[in-house]
Amino acid sequence: MKQGLTEVLEKQGFSYTIVPRGTDDTYRSVIEKTVYPGSGTAVVAALDFASTTEAAEIVGGSSVYGKYISGLYGVGMMPSLLDQLDKGTIRGLVVTNQFDAGYFAVQKAVQAIEKEQERSQLSLESYYIEKDELRSKKYEKMLYPID
């Protein structure tokens, strides 16, 4: 995923910084450096659930950061992330149907128990959603399976 992101950014002429997780305050310190006067604005693209959650907590927890972070995009569909999307802290999320993922995991476990040797690759569809699609019928069962 990282390679695809960097290729798109380079093609479009954007500059970027890849920040691997180091310590507990790695992302916070990078975001703080972004908010200095004259630094312009930045977009944060978090490539996994943990990074998305942490970035959303940092950006959403400060009235100042939102002025300099023009967009936060990430991965995941936990209720806390959907809430941050609804509040506007997160601009877009890539989500995958977790019910389908669980179903396929059980299906493969049963096949392994029954000693079926056929191994096949499974593909799950991912969707990019923004705030206006949170309550869309198209994604309702996937995003809110218990409601």
Where are the regions that the model predicts?
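Short, solvent-exposed amphipathic alpha-helices that sit
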Residues: M1-S15, V30, E54, I58, ...
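Hydrophobic alpha-helical segments within soluble ligand-binding/sensing domains
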Residues: M1-Q3, Y27-R28, G76-L81, T96-E114
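Short beta-strand elements at the ligand-binding edges of bilobed clamshell
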Residues: K87-F99
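Short beta-strand elements in bilobed, periplasmic/extracellular small-molecule ligand-binding domains
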Residues: L5-R28, V43, E125
